[in-house]
Amino acid sequence: MASNGERAAGARADGAGRLTAKGERTRGRIVAAAARLMHEGSVTETTIEDVKAAAGASSSQLYHYFADKEALVQAVIDHQADTIVGTTEQAGLGTPDGLRAWRDLVVAQAARSSGQGGCPLGSLGGQLAETDARARGQVADGFGRWSDALRAGLRELAAAGRLRPGPDPDALAVTLLASLQGGLLLAQVERDTRPLETALDTFLTLILA
């Protein structure tokens, strides 16, 4: 039977410095487990031992990919940002139906946990912004990418004449993201998605022609 060290070695980088397919899967499993635990609980209360147990990973595997908990947190921030931005980019926000479908998806995701955990990216920012400058910068970059994805869809709507006259798409993207964050926070503390639904529905009513 292979030892933990041998299993970790089998997942290490190839000669070009890239992770092997097995290594990518193992690292991804660890990051996903850490992201779930930190979202359901908090960054502070999530321990390395918790992550190992949730991911089914050994110490040698985890420390092969992450030097310490700080490095793991950085990977979690990137994971949450990549997931959110990818979903937003694929949502087809350039049409009214696509924007409404995205609204429904956001509400459905929040409803599954009755708002618990709040925004997967925003909650990390709230926990880390005052104590970890690097993490704060990472979260800010994630929000910037998210805003860019929203802006792209709103620009398509504007070009198609589907937005009411008023603020430009760049300003609307920031407004939508801020409304979304506020709605998710209220849904979290009230354990009810109605504030989120109200925020998004009001925004869509005000902007769509």
Which stretches of residues belong to each language-model region?
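Helix-turn-helix
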Residues: A2, R29, A33-A71, A75
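C-terminal peripheral helix-coil segments that are non-catalytic and often amphipathic
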Residues: M1-D14, A101-Q109, G144-A160, S179, ...
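Generic hydrophobic, amphipathic alpha-helix propensity
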Residues: G23-A34, V51, V76-Q80, I84, ...
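Amphipathic alpha-helical packing segments from all-alpha helical-bundle domains
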Residues: V85, E89-Q90, D97-A101, A133-A159, ...
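Amphipathic alpha-helical segments used for helix-helix packing
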Residues: V73, S113-R134
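Amphipathic alpha-helical linker/stalk segments
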Residues: E40, Q74-D104
